[in-house]
Amino acid sequence: MEKTNINNSDIIVGLDIGTTKVSIIIGRKNQYDKIEILGNGKALSSGVSRGIVSNIDKTVASIKLAIEEVEKKNDIKINEVFVGIAGQHIKSLQHRGEIVRDNVEIEIGQVDIDKLKDNMFKLITIPGEEVIHVIPQEYTVDGEDGIQDPKGMAGVKLEANFHVITAQVGAVKNIMRCVEKAGLVPKELILEPFASAVATLDDDELREGVALVDIGGGTTDVAIFLDKIIRHTAVIPFGGNIVTKDIKTGLSILEKQAELLKIKFGSAMYTEEQDNVMVSIPGLRGREPKEIAVKNLSEIIGARMKEIIDLVYHEIKVSGYESKLMTGIVLTGGGSQVKNLQQLVSFITAKETRIGYPNEHIANESKDLVTSPMFSTGVGLVLKGFEKKIKNISKNNTKDSFEESSKKKKSSSLIAKFTSFFEDDID
């Protein structure tokens, strides 16, 4: 059957380029206005280290393999993609900005808010870095603080606290270059913690306070939400890969054997049932099989996972929102699948913890395709892609001159490739 070009308004494609895997997920809205996942493709990732492209050719090859799989399985041809981006080069800071308005008789409007936010994109950063997201936390009008939406109010001085996110220009451009060399068009770049949040969290969690912990292969992303606003983000430079390497070194086995052991028999906490349980590893080139104690395996995994969760908990505490996380912690990503990790996190943080699966907002018939937390980012990219299209339609109907001029100023910058719909809230 001839392949159909899917570059149309009905279908969204998400591309997740991770340290251990590249995955592509295709979705569309069904007749009930629910997102239906049509298919997915994945390939081993060999050109990415801790979220940063380290080898262009290898990364392109991995993307092409994922493309080939999803196109064959679904008999389609993909073109435009919403691309996830993460990595230890992503940084965040808190900043306060202000503007003084000329006429108090004219009520505060979107133009004033956009002007205030636009000033944040001009912040002086470290050479090679650029501001990619500006997320308002709360506004102050003539000294009156705690305002969530100042539109329609009267006032001269408009201030706001912002959560500002920066990225290395080179790292972002390398991601885009890989996507383009693989024959795809990067429609938008989306920070992966934001995508995972949309796929796994519900409205109550986003509103009442939650910490999303996305454990990938190379890094662990932390994103804190309260009142449906992103309050804090951080990147921990460790993920599931380092656990596998610890097992390899500690047990003197091959890396692929270590990964299989982690998946099949690994645990983040020791339990009595592990006593005297042994696993046999086949020997190489005629060597004798190696006996591995499951208890030893759990001790290795537990030590590293405790280190990662301690770093996560430190970020939660320094954010200032520890006491406000009424719904606790949600774990997702491939690294969250380690047995008993949920219990370890609850023990360390004394907070309710659950595993976040990427089926929170998709049609029931699609859930079997993306049951694993490893697909949270990919599903979230599809969901955010549809949200972006809806917001674009709304903006096209209500554009003002400032928005147009602002877009023109940013068009030559990396900012133009980043979605901006995180900057107000997550809904």
Task: Tell what function each PLM region has.
Residues 356-402:
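Glycine-rich phosphate-binding/hydrolytic loop that grips phosphoryl groups
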